[in-house]
């Protein structure tokens, strides 16, 4: 089971938490999900140079709080906060609610699975050999302290006639261990030969009970 499912989804409520945290009345749920999807899509497109890892959304009353995790927060904030103010106005028009934006810096982008996946995809689009791009991502993550890394690419690799899947792994990857802190990222590279899917798994160590309680005191 651990080999097949999204490793973050499998660990929700154990060592991982939800990216959208809100409660909706009956009839509003679908609307909020659609809104969340639109917000994430808009921010990812507008801030793609900033290296967006993930976007957490919280709602309370007429207020929407967005927590944006970025590798380059300076691009999001802009000079004297000009960019973030403009962004806030655009988002408030979209959701018709007050929007609060909190920018969090991703201190080690080499250990963030989503950013590693996007970096590998960018190299594939620039026609870097897929094996070299994958091995480069793995060695970089291991150098920064990952206990295990697995990168998988699927599609017409190297312009081959028949699509196939290749993967490389270094270190441990205990997908069945629920207390294992495994980060997962997925993206697609649009090459001249077609779309290549890139999946990245990064194992950062095991989260013990005391660590979980410290991170989530209400649990």
From Swiss-Prot:
Q: Please give the name of this protein.
A: Small ribosomal subunit protein uS3
List the keywords (alphabetical): Ribonucleoprotein, Ribosomal protein, RNA-binding, rRNA-binding
Q: Which residues form the KH type-2 domain?
A: 39-107
Name any one GO molecular function: structural constituent of ribosome
The cross-references to InterPro entries, in alphabetical order and at most eight, read: KH_dom, KH_dom-like_a/b, KH_dom_type_2, KH_sf_prok-type, Ribosomal_S3_C_sf, Ribosomal_uS3_bac-typ, Ribosomal_uS3_C, Ribosomal_uS3_CS
UniProt cross-references to SUPFAM superfamilies, sorted A to Z:
Prokaryotic type KH domain (KH-domain type II) (SSF54814), Ribosomal protein S3 C-terminal domain (SSF54821)
| Cellular component, GO, one term | cytosolic small ribosomal subunit
Question: Could you tell me which SMART domains the record lists for this protein?
Answer: KH
Query: A GO term (biological process) for this protein?
Result: translation
Query: What is this protein's function?
Result: Binds the lower part of the 30S subunit head. Binds mRNA in the 70S ribosome, positioning it for translation.
């Amino acid at each position: 089971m651990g080999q097949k499912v999204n490793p973050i989804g499998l660990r929700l409520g154990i060592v991982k938490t939800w990216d959208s945290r809100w409660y909706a009345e009956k009839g509003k749920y679908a609307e909020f999900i659609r809104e969340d999807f639109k917000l994430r899509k808009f921010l990812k497109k507008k801030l793609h140079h900033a290296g967006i890892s993930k976007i957490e959304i919280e709602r309370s009353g007429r207020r929407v709080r967005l927590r944006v995790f970025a590798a380059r927060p300076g691009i999001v904030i802009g000079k004297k906060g000009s960019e973030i103010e403009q962004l806030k106005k655009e988002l408030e028009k979209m959701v018709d609610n007050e929007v609060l934006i909190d920018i969090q810096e991703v201190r080690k982008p080499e250990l963030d699975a989503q950013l590693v996946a996007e970096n590998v995809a960018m190299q594939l689009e620039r026609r870097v050999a897929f094996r070299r791009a994958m091995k480069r991502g793995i060695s970089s993550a291991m150098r920064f302290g990952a206990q295990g890394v697995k990168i998988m690419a699927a599609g017409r690799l190297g312009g081959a006639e028949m699509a196939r899947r290749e993967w490389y792994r270094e270190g441990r990857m205990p997908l069945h261990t629920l207390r294992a802190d495994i980060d997962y990222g997925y993206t697609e590279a649009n090459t001249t030969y077609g779309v290549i899917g890139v999946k990245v798994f990064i194992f950062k160590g095991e989260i013990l009970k005391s660590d979980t309680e410290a991170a989530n005191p209400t649990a």
